[in-house]
């Protein structure tokens, strides 16, 4: 699963997920991409599950780029523990997703195969998505 090798701080505050994706919103590496249209948090497990679904569908053809990385730790206190006594321990890692963020990119397969692979991947993700192609200027 994806997670940072080391971080400056072990735990972070919750924060707010507002605004639109300023960076990473265009197809940069492949020819077709899966772009988020909604906002939310994607866990490392969900990123991996979507990657596996795509990889199984394209069957060794083409290349996949993962454009998101889970760099935010989410903490959780154990069950039946009273409030207080500090922040809980880190349970999993998430990537915060804003509308417009490119999640995955692909090349080397036909467009209909790529669209079907992205459809399978989108079913594993908690944010709404759309398929976009690279615009040639």
From Swiss-Prot:
Q: Mind telling me which residue stretches traverse the membrane in this protein?
A: none
Q: Which UniProt keywords apply?
A: Ribonucleoprotein, Ribosomal protein, RNA-binding, rRNA-binding, tRNA-binding
Q: Which Gene3D superfamilies match?
A: Ribosomal protein L10e/L16 (3.90.1170.10)
Q: What Pfam families does UniProt report for this protein, alphabetically?
A: Ribosomal_L16
Report the family membership.
Belongs to the universal ribosomal protein uL16 family.
Q: Which GO terms describe its biological process?
A: translation
Q: Which GO terms describe its molecular function?
A: rRNA binding; structural constituent of ribosome; tRNA binding
- What GO CC terms are in its UniProt record? cytosolic large ribosomal subunit
**What top-level branch of life does the organism fall under?**
Bacteria
Question: What does this chain do?
Answer: Binds 23S rRNA and is also seen to make contacts with the A and possibly P site tRNAs.
Subunit relationships:
Part of the 50S ribosomal subunit.
Q: What is this protein called?
A: Large ribosomal subunit protein uL16
InterPro entries with a match to the protein in the record: Ribosomal_uL16, Ribosomal_uL16_bact-type, Ribosomal_uL16_CS, Ribosomal_uL16_dom, Ribosomal_uL16_sf
Q: Native species of this protein?
A: Alcanivorax borkumensis (strain ATCC 700651 / DSM 11573 / NCIMB 13689 / SK2)
